[in-house]
């Protein structure tokens, strides 16, 4: 599972850990805001300390992202479609990473999309964060995800994290 430091991944990773099955939690920064990365790493450490079935670490994807960026010769001041296409590349690079580690460890990739964002308005990247094997909170509204976060006693920093797609260099 990819851990972003947000409430959706916080809830899903905690629920996965509670199953007792092997869980691999990955933080995958790509030009990430420092507070997002630190929340994600703190949550992974929390899971590893509380659940013996959890392993986790950070996979820095900045270098492969920059290589793609330079290969495609993206112009930041040009076409909006080009910017969006490359923003979605972040999600696809993370998906590739999750499936790599999933396959070498014999694990499924678990999604963090909720009912409204992923399955209501389609706020996900095709073949990116939408490309998963299981989606435990796919039927939950965001309000229900927040209720679960409270019930699971997740840290305030995760419960209060500003939702972001993690695809841009700024919070949005």
Where are these regions (language model features)?
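Catalytic subdomain that performs nucleotidyl-dependent activation
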Residues: 86, 108-172
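ATP-dependent adenylation/nucleotidyltransferase module used to activate substrates
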Residues: 1-123
């Amino acid at each position: 599972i990819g851990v972003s430091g947000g409430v959706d991944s916080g809830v899903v990773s905690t629920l996965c850990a509670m199953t007792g099955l092997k869980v691999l939690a990955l933080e995958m920064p790509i030009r990430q805001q420092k507070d997002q990365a630190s929340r994600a790493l703190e949550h992974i450490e929390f899971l590893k300390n509380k659940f013996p079935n959890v392993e986790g670490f950070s996979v820095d994807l900045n270098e492969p992202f920059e290589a793609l960026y330079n290969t495609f010769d993206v112009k930041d001041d040009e076409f909006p479609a080009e910017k969006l296409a490359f923003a979605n590349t972040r999600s696809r690079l993370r998906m590739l990473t999750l499936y790599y580690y999933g396959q070498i460890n014999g694990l499924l990739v678990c999604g963090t999309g909720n009912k409204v964002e992923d399955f209501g308005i389609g706020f996900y990247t095709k073949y990116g964060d939408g490309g998963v094997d299981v989606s435990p909170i796919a039927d939950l509204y965001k309000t229900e995800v927040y209720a679960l976060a409270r019930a699971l006693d997740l840290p305030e920093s995760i419960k209060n994290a500003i939702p972001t797609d993690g695809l841009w260099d700024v919070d949005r």
